[in-house]
């Protein structure tokens, strides 16, 4: 017999009855029923009920056991007594009568229980992550993550892609976030950087004659805490292809992502034939570039119905050309209580309020706005929005660039409050035609809005003749249920166009050469047209596991202060290590 086990804790069935077996695992739960001890023994594969009564030679040893002790149990498989089967367990028809117990690893008092799914403070869970990972839901999420990554790999290879690994130590480059820097011992005063993404390397692969690259790539960004991204590192399905158009990339990747979602959707519907939504349309209809299409609400510009109207607040605003009035339909929201609740919510978001119109039976509009603009305009708004009696509409006004984010939040709030969001689907879409540049209010300059290596629509001519803020790029995102899960673009593969694109964003040619020397040189020796994308593995897994917390699908995540509480990182290092790296610390005054 094997030293530790003949079977796993998830293996025993009716066919094993009367066999002598050996199991090893953790004491998940111990129950005393009238002097009979029931030990639920757990391992990675499942759970088996083991029984020790006073007649068992191992009864005295069983009495000493405590939760999460690691033990070896020998015993005989038998049928559970009639009426005590557990249909929720694969092993639920049988139990093991214990004849011998060996304690392999006793456990101290637990800082958090493994049995059950009760909530515990996050710092405790992260500090004792090895215990947290034993809990059923989190353990299953990690296994699902592995299966999803396997599915991605399989589907990418079926599409003709090849998996390569790119370097982890590289050069620092301006890709939108701070780099994690690694000092060089051999080259004093110089630093490597951990890659924010394999962007330059995957483009260099295309210039090296490879095609259809992918990898599950770790990425590192020294960013301030964000709710939708873990501090430190994350993983992406990184992709690049040569001699392709935007449509070619869509045709290659849509089946991969759709297939992964269908495989792990657990009965939810998955969009087939994804819609393509222009960035400008997405912002106008949904108030965001990552729309949740499970929500059927589409906002509309209804400025004409308020221009010159009796509602002077909006009418005066509309005298300025940049201002608009947008309507947010609220099907079924035509009650005073709901409209007042939305108005209070808007005030809680720092807004002056949220104007509204309700439609009564017979189509009559009600509310302060309806009273001020009159029945004809009210009816025209109702018809434009496709609303009926019992519905409402909410209004935001001003400069769309300033209110669009709030309008998107209001659309989401209305959809949630009126139960309009279809929770039984994964609604996938492409968002296309992103602006190449945006105006950075902090730095008072034009900056890249997305990936700086993307091809502008119109090429070099657009860069030299158009207002930079009107240039669109061959950039695209994949969105799902309100999350951006992938981003990509066709690359700017001509060196003169690359230099011009960076020049508009404030980078001189020499700075481009210094920062992107390897890629700049490669462009001089025959660069193919190429493009690609990167899909966020963590976010996809999060969606498919049905959680909204990235820590629930990650093995050993940091907390929001970028600390690994389990390993004690970041940590101080010895003076000797600092001397070897030629580093002297200049710490801020913490007094």
From Swiss-Prot:
Q: What is an example of a GO molecular function annotated in this UniProt entry?
A: ATP binding
**Could you tell me which Pfam families the record lists for this protein?**
GAD, tRNA-synt_2, tRNA_anti-codon
Q: Where is this site: Important for tRNA non-discrimination?
A: 33, 83
Renumbered to this chain, region (Aspartate) spans: 199-202
Recorded catalytic activity of this chain's protein = tRNA(Asx) + L-aspartate + ATP = L-aspartyl-tRNA(Asx) + AMP + diphosphate
State the InterPro entries in the record.
Aa-tRNA-synt_II, aa-tRNA-synth_II, aa-tRNA-synth_II/BPL/LPL, Asp-tRNA-ligase_1, Asp-tRNA-ligase_1_N, Asp/Asn-tRNA-synth_IIb, AspRS_core, GAD-like_sf
State where ATP binds. 221-223, 484, 536-539
Q: What class of enzyme is it?
A: ligase
Q: Where does L-aspartate bind?
A: 175, 221, 450, 491
Please provide, in alphabetical order, the Gene Ontology terms of the cellular component aspect for this entry: cytoplasm
Q: Does the keyword Aminoacyl-tRNA synthetase apply?
A: yes
Its function? Aspartyl-tRNA synthetase with relaxed tRNA specificity since it is able to aspartylate not only its cognate tRNA(Asp) but also tRNA(Asn). Reaction proceeds in two steps: L-aspartate is first activated by ATP to form Asp-AMP and then transferred to the acceptor end of tRNA(Asp/Asn).
* UniProt family annotation: Belongs to the class-II aminoacyl-tRNA synthetase family. Type 1 subfamily.
Oligomer and partners: Homodimer.
The protein, known as = Aspartate--tRNA(Asp/Asn) ligase
Organism of derivation = Rhodopseudomonas palustris (strain ATCC BAA-98 / CGA009)
Lineage of origin:
Bacteria, Pseudomonadati, Pseudomonadota, Alphaproteobacteria, Hyphomicrobiales
* Chain's gene name: aspS
């Amino acid at each position: 017999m094997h030293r530790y086990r003949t079977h796993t804790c998830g293996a025993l069935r009716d066919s094993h009855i009367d066999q002598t077996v050996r199991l090893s695992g953790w004491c998940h739960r111990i129950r005393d029923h009238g002097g009979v001890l029931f030990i639920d023994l757990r391992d990675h594969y499942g759970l088996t009920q083991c029984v020790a009564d006073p007649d068992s030679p191992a009864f005295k040893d069983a009495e000493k056991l405590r939760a999460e002790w690691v033990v070896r149990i020998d015993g005989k498989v038998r049928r559970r007594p009639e009426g005590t089967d557990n249909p929720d367990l694969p092993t639920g028809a049988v139990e093991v009568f214990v004849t011998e117990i060996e304690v392999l690893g006793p456990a101290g008092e637990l800082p958090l229980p493994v049995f059950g799914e009760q909530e515990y403070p996050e710092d405790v869970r992260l500090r004792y992550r090895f215990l947290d990972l034993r809990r059923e839901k989190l353990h299953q999420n990690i296994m699902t993550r592995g299966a999803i990554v396997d599915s991605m790999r399989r589907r990418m290879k079926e599409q003709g892609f090849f998996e390569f690994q790119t370097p982890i130590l590289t050069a620092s480059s301006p890709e939108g976030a701070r780099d994690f820097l690694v000092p060089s011992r051999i080259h004093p005063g110089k630093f490597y950087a951990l890659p924010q993404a394999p962007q330059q390397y995957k483009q260099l692969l295309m210039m090296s004659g490879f095609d259809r690259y992918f990898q599950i790539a770790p990425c590192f960004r020294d960013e301030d805490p964000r709710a939708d991204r873990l501090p430190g590192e994350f993983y992406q399905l990184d992709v690049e292809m040569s001699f392709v158009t935007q449509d070619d990339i869509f045709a290659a990747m849509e089946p991969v992502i759709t297939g992964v979602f269908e495989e792990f959707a657990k009965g939810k519907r998955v969009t087939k034939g994804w819609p393509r939504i222009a960035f400008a349309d997405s912002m106008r209809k949904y108030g965001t570039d990552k729309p949740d299409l499970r929500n059927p609400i589409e906002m509309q510009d209804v400025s004409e119905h308020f221009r010159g109207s009796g509602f002077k607040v909006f009418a005066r605003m509309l005298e300025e050309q940049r201002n608009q009035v947008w309507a947010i339909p609220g099907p079924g929201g035509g009650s005073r209580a709901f409209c007042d609740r939305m108005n209070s919510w808007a005030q809680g978001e720092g807004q002056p309020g949220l104007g509204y119109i309700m439609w009564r039976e017979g189509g009559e509009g009600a509310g302060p706005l309806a009273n001020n603009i009159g029945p004809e305009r009210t009816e025209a708004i109702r018809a434009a929005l496709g609303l009926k009696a019992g519905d409402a509409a909410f209004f935001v006004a001003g400069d769309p660039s300033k209110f669009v984010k709030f309008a998107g939040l209001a659309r989401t709030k209305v959809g949630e409050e009126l139960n309009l969001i279809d929770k039984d689907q994964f609604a996938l879409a492409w968002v296309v035609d992103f602006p190449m540049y945006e105006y950075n209010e902090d730095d008072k300059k034009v900056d890249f809005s997305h990936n700086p290596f993307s091809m502008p629509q119109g090429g070099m001519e657009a860069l030299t003749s158009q207002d930079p803020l009107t240039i669109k790029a061959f950039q695209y995102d994949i969105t799902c249920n309100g999350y951006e899960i992938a981003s990509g673009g066709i690359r700017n593969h001509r060196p003169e166009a690359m230099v011009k694109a960076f020049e508009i964003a404030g980078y001189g040619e020499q700075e481009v050469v210094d920062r992107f020397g390897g890629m700049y040189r490669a462009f001089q020796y025959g660069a193919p047209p190429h493009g690609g994308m990167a899909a966020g593995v963590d976010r996809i897994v999060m969606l498919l596991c049905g959680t909204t917390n990235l820590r629930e699908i990650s093995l050993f995540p940091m907390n929001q202060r970028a600390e690994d509480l389990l390993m004690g990182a970041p940590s101080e290092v010895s003076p000797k290590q600092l001397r070897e790296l030629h580093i002297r610390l200049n710490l801020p005054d913490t007094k």
